[in-house]
Amino acid sequence: MAEIRNFTLNFGPQHPAAHGVLRLVLEMDGEIIQRADPHVGLLHRATEKLAESKPFNQSIGYMDRLDYVSMMCNEHGYVKAIETLLGIEPPLRAQYIRTMFDEITRILNHLMWLGAHGLDIGAMTVFLYCFREREDLMDCYEAVSGARMHATYYRPGGVYRDLPETMPGYQPSKWHNEKEVAIINRNREGSLLDFIEDFTARFPTCVDEYETLLTDNRIWKQRTVGIGVVTPERALQLGFTGPMLRGSGVEWDLRKKQPYAAYDQIDFDIPVGVNGDCYDRYLVRIEEMRQSNQIIKQCVDWLRKNPGPVIVNNYKVAAPPREKMKNDMEVLIHHFKLFTEGYCVPEGEAYAAVEAPKGEFGVYLISDGANKPYRLKVRAPGFAHLAAMDEMVQGHMLADVVAIIGTMDIVFGEIDR
């Protein structure tokens, strides 16, 4: 009798559902997966090593490029670690601005996840809907930093600058005439806070539209219910964090359990799943978008009523205002020193973690008293999730691999670093 052997299949790295450069070596019995071996490292850029050769401030831009769809949350973890070593506390207004932009980033990330996850499984419409809202939020990034993605807006001691009083508007072009541009610009006539407030009023209706397309859709449920089930105990053992852990029914969120920035002064709920499958993780992320919208609303209200400084008044750490540089030689020297050799951080080590959209993004920083980190270690949430791939796909069909990769919300920038 002929020997029956398992079939080995390479999934990725050139695959639209591989979310970057994932290579999976799948051992299959017919259509059923027996084993999955993820191969990582194809997007390794030596970020941790690069940070050791640059002054502390110059590595903020590298953080944006780790998980490149949750940019400001990565920056937050890094500057938080530096602030711990320096022993400085950002002004309260800066804390609220950070909280607001962390939540804008969370919505940006979840919209990208939902659109891509839907497209992977075959729901094309939701992809177009999600990118419609992402445009507005990227304009918020652009308003404060000039960049739509890699903002480099957070600084040790606060944020780069206060929220602008005007919003950039669209100009007439060969694609949009003056009448169309006037319609697009109608909510851009006020300040950035006005624009964000207008967005928060519209966004719940947009989430309802996504749910109309997917939540009760029987094809969506057939593809996600009971797929990639992880028990609460196993999720904790595997080091899951964020929506992957909460989807399994564990109520753990750093914003509540270890509050940072202004989260201890804001009212919001933690959505938690029941079954630990792809469908529950989808519902958790959908509800997180609604909660983030509520947090942004509260931040906008507070920021309107409380003007003030947005960065510490210490020119050894924070850049001085340009007006002072024109009149005061000492301030000019501070500016020159800050942007050439930076500042020396006291000897010691610190771990700072933030609740990034994908889970706990942690930065472990060791300083030897120089102006560069001695060692920078990034704790990427996606790495722990990808490590569970073999366990999650065993016994499932080949088509379910795509649903499981999608539900993990994997970005290889942070996994390969």
UniProtKB/Swiss-Prot annotation:
It is an enzyme of class 7 (translocase). NDH-1 is composed of 14 different subunits. Subunits NuoB, C, D, E, F, and G constitute the peripheral sector of the complex. This is NADH-quinone oxidoreductase subunit D. It catalyses: a quinone + NADH + 5 H(+)(in) = a quinol + NAD(+) + 4 H(+)(out). It is found in: Cell inner membrane. It comes from Nitrosococcus oceani (strain ATCC 19707 / BCRC 17464 / JCM 30415 / NCIMB 11848 / C-107). It holds the Pfam family Complex1_49kDa. Its EC number is 7.1.1.-.
